[in-house]
Design a protein with these regions (language model features):
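Non-catalytic tandem-repeat scaffold regions and their flanking low-complexity/translocation tails
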Residues: 1-264
Length: 264
């Protein structure tokens, strides 16, 4: 039953009257209607509780964490909008209702990348399947310069270190080349990495290598590789691309990425 005289719209999908609070068409039974509000950050709260979305309930409930209600706020906004899983109060940052050991005042997403930083460290949020929850992992101490190849890249330069997702894969080197060459493929100086693992260490001359077909094909003047496999029947010196997925050497045309020989 709605009391029409006191019914008001609070925020997107939120409303209340003098006795009840609604999220969409569901009454939030645990909410104190008199004190309930949605603050300017979009965080629902009453005098005693912050309310968080529960996937299993498909609705909101009071948070289990001991968060300071008065100062609590959402603070993470990415390309697809507000992220409800991140909350901070005057002292701490919380992710999925877990208090984090980070610096509250400087903790923030690193642009649209996979990482987060505060004044001291780099972090990444990762799904822990055994606990069935997200965790925030400390990856490395924060260095300078910090550089991503692009917003979706899995690689991050952190000063003299190179990070792949939540792992430091190269430590304490002078970085003079940092370049993405394919899907999860990256060159660091004269080293080639795929999914964070160094590949073709003693096979490919990375400094002169060319990459084709989203990085699946790599060549130098003596070798042609598809992924990690050397293709010995291709003439590397004359091998080149002639269309999006078509290549040739002095003997054959190779179609798609298999490659399949087609006589000239």
């Amino acid at each position: 039953d709605v009391n029409e005289e006191t019914f008001i719209i609070l925020y997107d999908n939120w409303a209340k009257d003098k006795k009840h609070v609604w999220y969409q068409d569901k009454i939030i039974e645990t909410a104190d209607a008199v004190s309930f509000s949605v603050d300017k950050s979009g965080l629902p709260k009453d005098k005693d509780h912050v309310f968080v979305y529960d996937v299993d309930m498909s609705s909101f409930r009071p948070s289990y964490c001991n968060i300071d209600v008065a100062s609590a706020e959402h603070f993470v906004y990415k390309g697809d909008g507000q992220d409800w899983t991140w909350i901070r109060d005057k002292d701490f940052v919380y992710h999925d209702e877990t208090k984090l050991d980070v610096d509250r005042n400087t903790f923030a997403p690193l642009g649209e990348t996979h990482w987060w930083t505060d004044k001291d460290c780099i972090y990444m949020d990762s799904w822990n399947s055994s606990l069935n929850k997200w965790e925030v992992i400390k990856v490395d101490s924060l260095q300078s310069p910090i550089d991503t190849l692009n917003a979706g890249s899995h690689y991050l330069r952190n000063g003299r270190n190179i990070i792949y997702l939540a792992n430091v894969i190269v430590k304490d080197i002078e970085v003079y080349r940092f370049e993405e060459v394919g899907l999860s493929k990256c060159i660091v100086n004269d080293m080639l990495f795929n999914n964070g693992n160094r590949i073709l260490k003693d096979s490919l001359n990375v400094s002169e290598a060319k990459f084709y077909f989203y990085g699946h094909i790599a060549t130098d003047k003596n070798h042609v590789f598809y992924s990690r496999k050397q293709l010995n029947d291709i003439d590397a010196a004359s091998f080149h691309q002639i269309d999006d997925e078509i290549f040739e050497d002095k003997y054959y045309i190779y179609t798609h990425y298999c490659p399949v020989k087609v006589d000239k």
